[in-house]
Structure formats: structure tokens, C-alpha cells
UniProtKB/Swiss-Prot annotation:
GTP binds at D23, H24, G25, K26, S27, T28, N140, K141, I142, D143. This is Elongation factor 4. Belongs to the TRAFAC class translation factor GTPase superfamily. Classic translation factor GTPase family. LepA subfamily. Keywords: Cell membrane, GTP-binding, Hydrolase, Membrane, Nucleotide-binding, Protein biosynthesis. NCBIfam families: lepA (TIGR01393), small_GTP (TIGR00231). GO terms for cellular component: plasma membrane. It is found in: Cell membrane. Its EC number is 3.6.5.n1. Its main location: membrane. The lineage of its organism: Bacteria, Bacillati, Bacillota, Bacilli, Bacillales. It comes from the Bacteria.
Length: 607
């Protein structure tokens, strides 16, 4: 292709993504667009076409971003090339959204005609504005009986400040308004700017592992042209590779000889190791490198940590391989080896949130068939010791002793909850219970309120989302962002079984809740740990002070069964002898902790 053709083609490219709150109909809209542009025949169509993972289909959520190239002939008779980059909507996957937005010039903002604007809608709009994207609002689900298009139009203007006069009323399910959306994309989303002659600069916005081709990178070409056979260089590591294959997805992979400015496609170059392809890195040509890398996006830092241990210790290396594979396409997953006295060898893993953690665990169990024990999730605490050292503690068992700690700081988030105003009381009560500080409350319209609180991240991590949904019958939506660290009165709680500390059951708790929390867990463990031949005390301790205790009674044989009538001193002798035996047994006996017991401590419900 010569340069004039490249420039002509560049003018016809439109890169856009679809952003929305969970359940506002993003994946359905993507399906309809694929159908309308003839990318798939009706025989090949299935719901959630772009959600390739079984897990995504089952839960009805999008986890991974996906990119497809579509051809569309507009009403002006021109043929346009559209690159649709699908994005997730859940708060844990915000970084997936920011990655896909970095590869676009426009975003279609889907708002549910019945529900209106939700917390996540706002968060995604701000991400799109940060990336200077052209935002096209559309109002979806207009076929619902409870749809109120005019109210939502007004809401978009008042809350987000976008002009909604041209917002297309759509029903992705019924296929209404799809053509108008495509026409708006062609008319309003700018064509990519960039010079096909300049040195190559391509942004890696995703990658995955293929058993035959090694690591495959998804790229968006910003400047220059890349051809099969070119020697390319990764700018962050300086390593060189030869391009073996270029392709675009039309959902089916279609091989290309070259990718030029504005193209979104995949590149494979027999890259063997996962670490060589970093999401957010820039690819350039080895013989004519670009001066500087593209501004990648910020590194996402995990918010929640937990330990993963294989139940069968022999599968430790399999677990490592599974995590490495998942890390390829999931830039935010971090892990490092760790050992626990109770559970043996495993990994400490960092996740963006609880949903992210569940998804990764489920993928390891499904895709790699590894059964695991997980320890209670924990956040990173900053601990200042009396010696003036600052430690970053992500594992409660690494917390220094109480007397060596000067103070502990924990991460706080600013949480925005959007809710119908009937539930304001319930939400405020929940936030107060979770040690929240009230910041602000504003009415979006006559029926809906946005409440802002500052909360410790550790309180959100466990079950805040579930409790929020149940106290508002599922109507409230939540978005949160990290705002920094604040000092708190925190203590480490150890669980002792038969006077021995079980490190995997330790957790960090606020001093005011230590007694209640200890009592709940001790009682729960009492139900779950099987009875032994000897008595087992279960204790919850803060430092050297025991705050709660429960005892698992011993199983005992009836040694008096053979004494008919008989003298009391004879019976007493037998009972004393049994007591001695139990005492000896208690000295040497060890307590087996079943998997359910670890799990029970995780399900931190205090009811």
C-alpha cells in the first residue's frame, strides 16, 4: 500500500469504545452493531459475542476488553472502517476501561432509560474525558415499560454536562436506533491523527498467551507503519523481535501484511516470556526507533491481597504457571511466593477488588484444574515502628508485635453511592457501621441521591457491596477511588488452637470491634473443627491478651460401662486413669483444621 492510500484509509477509520454501568446493555449493543455491519451472519450470532470467556457469559458481565474491526457503508456512500473496543463496566475493572480508551478517539456512552445515570457511568465518563474522547450519549432500553427518555436526557445534561439533545434513543435488544448510532460515530468521532511515514509508535493495550505463537500483543498504531518481517523493539525493555504475523479481528482473525496509523490489531513475534510484553508499552522499529515512548497509562496498583495455596503441595509449580499465564492478559494481577506454617507453600496475590479476586480464583480452578485454599483478603497497611521504620504490610501474619508499633495507617477510599432516596437512611447506617465519615449528599433529581462517604478500604473489601445491595433491594450503585492513608487504631488478632497460633487465620481489625469479631470467629471455628479425643481450646488474642475463647469438648469413651454396681472408689480410679491419658494426649496431639474453617473466617458475616 502506498502512502496516499494509507492516508485515504486513515481518514475512513473510526476508533470507538462503548462505556456504561453494569447491566445497561453494553454487550447487547455490541452484538447489534456486529450484526448491522454484517461482521457475523445471523447463524454465527450468539448473545454476548465479544465476551469470549464462559465465566463472562455465566455471570453476564464483561471482564476482558475485546477489539473488532467492522466495515460500514454510511448514508453518504463512503465505506468506513470502525474499530469497536468493548470494555467492562464493573468498578474492579476500571483499568481495563482506561486501557481500551487509550486506544480510541471516541466513546459511546450507554445509559439505561429506566435506571438513569449510575455511579459507574460517571466514573467511566471522567476516564473518557481524561483521554480527550468525543463522547456520544445514547439512551438504551427504550422498549421497557418504565423507560423515561426525557428524564434521562435531562439527567445526562445536568449530572454529566454533556449535550444530550442528539442522544439516540435505542433498544439494543429490539435493534432500534442502531443505524443512527453508526451514523453519529462516522460523523462525530474524529479520524485518527498520525503520520504513516513517521517512525513507528504502537501502543500495547492488551496481550494474551497462545500455545503455538507465544505471546500475542493487541496494539493500536499511533504513528508509522508495521509490516510482517519488520524488526521491532519494545521501548521499556529494549528487546528486539521479528514480526511473524499481523491480524485484525473481524471477530474472526484476518491476517494482514501491514498495520498503519489508526489500525487496531494483534501482533505476534515469537515472544516467549510473559515479561517482555508489558501492557502500556510502546513498540517501535529497531532500525528507525521513535524518540520517546507514548504516554502509557498509569500502573494499576492492587488494592486487595490474599494468599493462594494449592491443596496438593505437588501442584505448586502448576499454580505458578497458571498465575503467570493469567498475568499476561491481566496487567493488574501481582503475585509473589510465600510460605505459611499452617498451609505450606503458596503465593501472595494482589487484586484490584473482590470481584477481580473471585474471577481469578475461579479461572485458575476452571482453566487449570487446581484446587486451592485462599486466606482472608487484606489490604496494604503502612506500619510505623517505634524505631521510626515504615513497613508496608500486606499479610496480617507479618505485622510486628504490638509493643514495637508506633502507629498504623490504613488506605481510605472516597465512595460515591447513588440510590433512590427511600434508602438514604439504610445507606448512612451501613456507612456509619463501617467506620465511614459523611462528606456530601446531593439530589440528582427528585427521586435519586448521590451520597459521598470516606471509608476505610478494608471495610469495603469484605462484604460492603453485598450489604449495600441487600439494604437497598439492589437499587444502589457504588463507585470508589483511593484517596490516601489515614491513621487508625488497628490491632492484629491471632487465633490460637490448642495454644498454638495458626498464622493463616490471623487478621487485622479495629480495636473497638476486636471483641465482637473475635467472638464471632471463635464460635464459628468451634462448629467447624471436628472433635478430638482431647479438649481443644480456641482463643482469639490481641497481643498477649485473650479477648474471646471457646472450647471443643473431648470425645470420651464410657470407661464405667463394665462396672456393674461396683464401688465408687473403683469408678473414680478408672475416671482418674482416663483423665491422665487425655492429659498426655493433649500434650502431643495436633489439631486438623478443615478447609471449611479457613473459608468460614473469610465469609466475614457477623450475623
Amino acid at each position: 500500500m502506498n502512502n496516499a492510500d494509507r492516508l485515504k484509509r486513515q481518514k475512513s477509520i473510526r476508533n470507538f469504545s462503548i462505556i456504561a454501568h453494569i447491566d445497561h446493555g453494553k454487550s447487547t449493543l455490541a452484538d447489534r452493531i456486529l450484526e448491522k455491519t454484517g461482521a457475523l451472519t445471523s447463524r454465527e450470532m450468539k448473545d454476548q459475542t465479544l465476551d469470549a470467556m464462559d465465566l463472562e457469559r455465566e455471570r453476564g458481565i464483561t471482564i476482558k476488553l475485546n477489539a473488532v474491526q467492522l466495515k460500514y457503508t454510511a448514508k453518504d456512500g463512503e465505506e468506513y472502517i470502525l474499530h469497536l473496543i468493548d470494555t467492562p463496566g464493573h468498578v474492579d475493572f476500571t483499568y481495563e476501561v482506561s486501557r481500551s480508551l487509550a486506544a480510541c478517539e471516541g466513546a459511546v456512552l450507554v445509559v439505561d432509560a429506566a435506571q438513569g445515570i449510575e455511579a459507574q457511568t460517571l466514573a467511566n465518563v471522567y476516564l473518557a474525558l481524561d483521554n480527550d474522547l468525543e463522547i456520544l450519549p445514547i439512551i438504551n432500553k427504550i422498549d421497557l415499560p418504565s423507560a423515561d427518555v426525557e428524564r434521562v436526557r435531562q439527567e445526562i445534561e445536568d449530572v454529566i454536562g454533556l449535550d444530550a439533545s442528539e442522544a439516540v434513543p435505542t433498544s439494543a435488544k429490539a435493534g432500534i436506533g442502531i443505524e443512527e448510532i453508526l451514523e453519529q460515530i462516522v460523523a462525530k468521532v474524529p479520524a485518527p491523527t498520525g503520520d504513516p511515514e513517521a517512525p513507528l509508535e504502537a501502543l500495547i493495550f492488551d496481550s494474551y498467551y497462545d500455545a503455538y505463537r507465544g505471546v500475542v500483543a493487541s496494539i493500536r498504531v499511533v504513528n508509522g507503519t508495521v509490516k510482517v518481517g519488520d524488526k521491532i523493539r519494545m521501548m521499556s525493555t529494549g528487546k528486539d523481535f521479528e514480526v511473524l504475523e499481523l491480524a485484525v479481528s473481524t471477530p474472526k482473525p484476518l491476517r494482514q501484511k501491514e498495520l498503519t496509523v489508526g489500525d487496531v490489531g494483534t501482533l505476534s513475534a515469537s515472544i516467549k516470556t510473559v515479561g517482555d510484553v508489558r501492557v502500556g508499552d510502546t513498540i517501535t522499529l529497531a532500525k528507525q526507533p521513535a524518540q520517546e515512548a507514548l504516554p502509557g497509562y498509569r500502573k494499576m496498583n492492587p488494592m486487595v491481597y490474599c494468599g493462594l495455596y494449592p491443596i496438593d503441595a505437588a501442584r505448586y509449580n502448576d499454580l505458578r504457571e497458571a498465575l503467570e499465564r493469567l498475568q499476561l492478559s491481566d496487567a493488574a494481577l501481582e503475585f509473589e511466593p510465600e510460605t505459611s506454617q499452617a498451609l505450606g507453600f503458596g503465593f501472595r496475590c494482589g487484586f484490584l477488588g473482590m470481584l477481580h479476586m473471585e474471577i481469578i480464583q475461579e479461572r485458575i480452578e476452571r482453566e487449570f484444574n487446581i484446587d486451592m485454599i485462599t486466606t482472608a483478603p487484606s489490604v496494604i497497611y503502612h506500619v510505623t515502628t517505634t524505631a521510626g521504620e515504615v513497613l508496608h504490610v500486606d499479610n496480617p501474619s507479618k505485622m510486628p508485635e504490638q509493643q514495637k508499633v508506633e502507629f498504623i495507617e490504613e488506605p481510605y477510599v472516597k465512595a460515591a453511592v447513588m440510590t433512590p432516596n427511600d434508602y438514604v437512611g439504610a445507606i448512612m447506617e451501613l456507612c456509619q457501621k463501617k467506620r465511614g465519615t459523611f462528606i456530601d449528599m446531593e439530589y440528582i433529581d427528585t427521586t435519586r441521591v448521590k451520597i459521598t462517604y470516606e471509608l476505610p478500604l478494608s471495610e469495603i473489601v469484605y462484604d460492603f457491596f453485598d450489604q449495600l445491595k441487600s439494604s437497598t433491594k439492589g437499587y444502589a450503585s457504588l463507585d470508589y477511588e483511593l484517596i490516601g492513608y489515614q491513621q487508625s487504631r488497628l490491632v492484629k488478632m491471632d487465633i490460637l488452637l490448642n495454644n498454638e497460633n495458626v498464622d493463616a487465620l490471623s487478621f487485622i481489625v479495629h480495636r473497638d470491634f476486636a471483641y465482637e469479631r473475635g467472638k464471632v470467629i471463635v464460635d464459628k471455628l468451634k462448629e467447624l473443627i471436628p472433635r478430638m479425643q482431647f479438649e481443644v481450646p480456641i482463643q482469639a488474642a490481641v497481643g498477649t491478651k485473650i479477648v474471646a475463647r471457646s472450647t471443643i469438648k473431648a470425645l470420651r469413651k464410657n470407661v464405667l460401662a463394665k462396672c456393674y454396681g461396683g464401688d465408687i472408689s473403683r469408678k473414680r480410679k478408672l475416671l482418674e486413669k482416663q483423665k491422665e491419658g487425655k492429659k498426655r494426649m493433649k500434650m502431643v496431639g495436633s489439631v486438623e483444621v478443615p478447609q471449611e474453617a479457613f473459608m468460614s473466617v473469610l465469609s466475614m458475616d457477623e450475623d
